[in-house]
Curated annotation (Swiss-Prot):
GO terms for molecular function: rRNA (pseudouridine) methyltransferase activity; rRNA binding. This is Ribosomal RNA small subunit methyltransferase Nep1. It comes from the Archaea. Keywords: Methyltransferase, Ribosome biogenesis, RNA-binding, rRNA processing, rRNA-binding, S-adenosyl-L-methionine, Transferase. It catalyses: a pseudouridine in rRNA + S-adenosyl-L-methionine = an N(1)-methylpseudouridine in rRNA + S-adenosyl-L-homocysteine + H(+). S-adenosyl-L-methionine binds at residues 147, 169, 174, 192-197. Its EC number is 2.1.1.-. NCBIfam families: PRK04171.2-4. Pfam families: EMG1 (PF03587). Methyltransferase involved in ribosomal biogenesis. Specifically catalyzes the N1-methylation of the pseudouridine corresponding to position 914 in M.jannaschii 16S rRNA. Belongs to the class IV-like SAM-binding methyltransferase superfamily. RNA methyltransferase NEP1 family. Homodimer. The lineage of its organism: Archaea, Methanobacteriati, Methanobacteriota, Archaeoglobi, Archaeoglobales. The record marks 61, 99, 102, 106 as: Interaction with substrate rRNA. It comes from Archaeoglobus fulgidus (strain ATCC 49558 / DSM 4304 / JCM 9628 / NBRC 100126 / VC-16).
Length: 219
């Protein structure tokens, strides 16, 4: 089966219906020549419109998962899968051979195309696609490690030795939804320290340890 890195509740969604008529959204849509419902929600552009949204503090930050994915896909190791679980509960699979745009605006365009077509391909190869599965399905059979501020401290050599699902939040503020925690089933809460860390920092630390443990195991 192998391991998997799963970015939980990623701030990755199209403009919700509730704010599609807001002046800030309409101005952005006109500027880009796209309909509001085809545009990715982005706090830097739609901040004033987002004030009325539920769980507003967790939304509109596609840059978080963009940075984390770039880091993961740069890893020379190929023994883990990569998934994105969105704030709306959808599952995106990312081919390890995918070369994501490093430019943020190009990444946004790619994600908007993904939401519209549900799959990105190059020739006969699927690079990124929405999967018709739930979070429970992609972690099944793996030891689930949930990185969380209030988790425990463990030795990475023990944690990362088998088939694991490394679960990292990909939203700016707040905590995981109870529904997400239920979907994970049995999991171990892991903390890197007493402070609150960014998703990118957590991904970097865990990936570094994962590569160290796996390289030692192979050697």
């Amino acid at each position: 089966m192998g391991s998997a890195f799963v970015f939980l509740e990623a701030s990755l969604e199209l403009i919700p219906q509730k704010i599609r008529g807001h002046p800030a959204v309409r101005a952005d849509a006109i500027r880009r020549g796209k309909r509001p419902e085809k545009i990715l929600l982005d706090d830097s552009k739609h901040h004033t419109a987002m004030k009325s949204l539920e769980f507003r503090e967790k939304r509109g930050r596609p840059d978080i998962v963009h940075q984390c994915l770039l880091l993961l896909l740069d890893s020379p190791l190929r023994d883990f899968e990569v998934y994105v679980h969105t704030l709306n509960g959808e599952i995106i699979w990312v081919n390890r051979e995918t070369r994501l745009p490093r430019n943020y605006n190009r990444f946004v365009g790619l994600m908007e195309k993904l939401f519209e077509e549900r799959r990105i391909t190059a020739g006969d190869t699927t690079l990124i696609e929405f999967k018709d599965v739930g979070l429970r399905d992609i972690v099944r059979g793996r030891d689930v490690l949930l990185f969380r501020e209030k988790g425990g401290r463990f030795e990475f050599s023990e944690l990362l030795d088998g088939d694991v699902a490394v679960c990292i939040g990909a939203f700016p503020h707040g905590d995981f939804f109870e529904e997400t925690l239920r979907e994970l089933g049995e999991f171990k809460e892991v903390s890197l320290g007493t402070e609150s860390y960014t998703s990118l920092y957590v991904t970097s630390r865990v990936l570094c340890e994962y590569e160290r443990v796996r390289a030692h195991k192979v050697g």
